[in-house]
């Protein structure tokens, strides 16, 4: 199994209860993708990757509780704490037009409508009103609001995001 065929989801932070449930912290802050999975791939501290069927997934506060087959008690899952979770992209639920998974946006080259390269989309900060794209340029970092007026086009095929930043935004 090639790791580049997988998309990063989150990390196992601890166990929950005595029946072998695992608490997953989602890196994107959204849960629907993890809740819809039939299988999950876990990469342990030793770098080894294993695929497990998902028996059950539920939201618990700000985490997802995963029950994986064949585990039924806490002692069987202790070695999975701190494992990083991945899933095959084809398991993700479909999105509406104009919606994107974070994992598809990270790494895009960000350019202005005039064609000036700003940098690469490095990470995404979730906020109450909208996400903020962290773009790493040659000599600095830019914070670009993920709003319709600023993000003009996303072209996943070309690997680009075109933005029309308000005057002064790139000077901050």
From Swiss-Prot:
Keyword DNA-binding appears in the UniProt entry: no
Molecular function per GO = ribosome binding
Localization per record:
Cytoplasm
The record's annotation in Pfam families points to: PRC_RimM (PF24986), RimM (PF01782)
Keyword set includes Endoplasmic reticulum: no
Gene Ontology cellular component list: cytosol; ribosome
What are the BP-aspect GO terms? maturation of SSU-rRNA
Start and end residues of each PRC barrel domain:
97-169
Please name the InterPro entries in this protein's record: PRC_barrel-like_sf, PRC_RimM, RimM, RimM_N, RimM_N_sf, Transl_B-barrel_sf
Where primarily located? cytoplasm
Matching SUPFAM superfamilies, A to Z?
Answer: PRC-barrel domain, Translation proteins
Q: Which UniProt keywords apply?
A: Chaperone, Cytoplasm, Ribosome biogenesis, rRNA processing
Instruction: Tell me how this protein assembles.
Output: Binds ribosomal protein uS19.
Domain remark from Swiss-Prot or TrEMBL: The PRC barrel domain binds ribosomal protein uS19.
HAMAP family associated with the record:
Ribosome_mat_RimM (MF_00014)
The free-text function statement in the UniProt record for this protein reads: An accessory protein needed during the final step in the assembly of 30S ribosomal subunit, possibly for assembly of the head region. Essential for efficient processing of 16S rRNA. May be needed both before and after RbfA during the maturation of 16S rRNA. It has affinity for free ribosomal 30S subunits but not for 70S ribosomes.
As for family, the record states: Belongs to the RimM family.
What's the protein called, per UniProt?
Ribosome maturation factor RimM
Which species expresses this protein natively? Answer: Geobacter sulfurreducens (strain ATCC 51573 / DSM 12127 / PCA)
Quick one: which gene encodes this?
rimM
């Amino acid at each position: 199994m090639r790791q580049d065929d997988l998309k990063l989801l989150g990390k196992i932070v601890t166990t929950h209860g005595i029946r072998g449930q695992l608490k997953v912290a989602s890196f994107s802050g959204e849960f629907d993708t993890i809740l819809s999975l039939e299988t999950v791939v876990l990469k342990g501290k030793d770098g080894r990757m294993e695929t497990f069927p998902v028996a059950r997934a539920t939201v618990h506060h700000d985490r997802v509780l995963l029950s994986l087959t064949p585990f039924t008690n806490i002692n069987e899952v202790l070695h999975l704490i701190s494992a990083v979770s991945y899933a095959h992209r084809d398991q993700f639920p479909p999105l509406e037009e104009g919606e994107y998974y974070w994992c598809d946006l990270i790494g895009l080259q960000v350019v202005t409508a005039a064609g000036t390269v700003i940098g690469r989309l490095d990470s995404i900060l979730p906020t109450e009103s909208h996400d903020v794209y962290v773009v790493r340029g040659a000599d600095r970092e830019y914070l670009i609001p993920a709003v319709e007026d600023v993000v003009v086009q996303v072209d996943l095929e070309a690997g680009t995001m075109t933005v029309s930043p308000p005057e002064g935004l790139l000077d901050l």
